[in-house]
UniProtKB/Swiss-Prot annotation:
Name assigned to this protein: Large ribosomal subunit protein bL12
Organism listed in the record: Thermotoga petrophila (strain ATCC BAA-488 / DSM 13995 / JCM 10881 / RKU-1)
Family: Belongs to the bacterial ribosomal protein bL12 family.
Function noted in UniProt: Forms part of the ribosomal stalk which helps the ribosome interact with GTP-bound translation factors. Is thus essential for accurate translation.
Keywords per UniProt: Ribonucleoprotein, Ribosomal protein
A Pfam family assignment: Ribosomal_L12_N
Subunit field text: Homodimer. Part of the ribosomal stalk of the 50S ribosomal subunit. Forms a multimeric L10(L12)X complex, where L10 forms an elongated spine to which 2 to 4 L12 dimers bind in a sequential fashion. Binds GTP-bound translation factors.
CDD domains found in the cross-reference section: Ribosomal_L7_L12
Length: 128
């Protein structure tokens, strides 16, 4: 029996049959199907902060302040988000609040590009 045939056979099982299969595999091999819980000693604070920064792959672009040129910042926000004029203006006016997220869950490079565009327009931006 090939691995593909085994997978096909498993796909045809009902939920109760799958539960029974898991139980028998646990008993046979002396293992558990529970998700492993990672327990590690607390690393040195400086090393932990550096590692956390490196591991982060998605960022939120947060508007801290629109600076002196609100109109230009609104134009850039519209360009980035595709929002209408009123929605972009409302978002820019939330600057400094937790709701002032221009874009969330974006890759690092895109987040940095957005930050650069907004800063060129005079805004103060933070990546979270």
């Amino acid at each position: 029996m090939t691995i593909d045939e085994i997978i096909e056979a498993i796909e045809k099982l009902t939920v109760s049959e799958l539960a029974e299969l898991v139980k028998k595999l646990e008993d046979k091999f002396g293992v558990t199907a529970a998700a492993p819980v990672a327990v590690a000693a607390a690393p040195v604070a400086g090393a932990a902060a550096g590692a956390a920064q490196e591991e982060k792959t998605e960022f939120d672009v947060v508007l801290k302040s629109f600076g002196q040129n609100k109109i230009q910042v609104i134009k850039v926000v519209r360009e980035i988000t595709g929002l209408g004029l009123k929605e972009a203006k409302d978002l820019v006016e939330k600057a400094g609040s937790p709701d002032a997220i221009i874009k969330s869950g974006v890759p690092k490079q895109e987040a940095e590009d957005i930050k650069k565009k907004l800063e060129e327009a005079g805004a103060e931006v933070e990546l979270k």
